[in-house]
Amino acid sequence: CDTATDYALAKAVGWDAKVILSVPCCQHELNRQIKNEILEPILKYGLLKERMAALITDGLRAQYLEREGYEAQILEFIDMEHTPKNILIRAVKKRHAKEDNNIEASIKRCEAALRVSPTLGRLLDGFATESANSEKDHPEKEDKEGV
């Protein structure tokens, strides 16, 4: 499945979902991409690299959701003894997406340091572009909502 969680999260954001609950299972993408000279002594061990990539993936997912106006939390929802995949991303819509230079800069620094380009970021950037183009093409929609 690889990036299925990213597509589901992007759809939820695109639909302006008020609450998003996601138990991500797909974190392989960054495992193939992640590179960092400082972390190389750790990343050379496949198991550790895989686990770090999974945590970084979910951390970035939460950051993208915050950038889009959600208050995001990452929680354990079941004991580790039952399954190692027990992370829940809970996001509640708090505001409209806006340019938050701190969140955006933080995301970009992390991506650059680890040399990763997550699918969710590209998908959400695509939605933002489509939304901006739609508003330009259909300004009457904005006028009706303002009445």
Regions found by a protein language model. Name each.
Residues 1-147:
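Class I S-adenosyl-L-methionine
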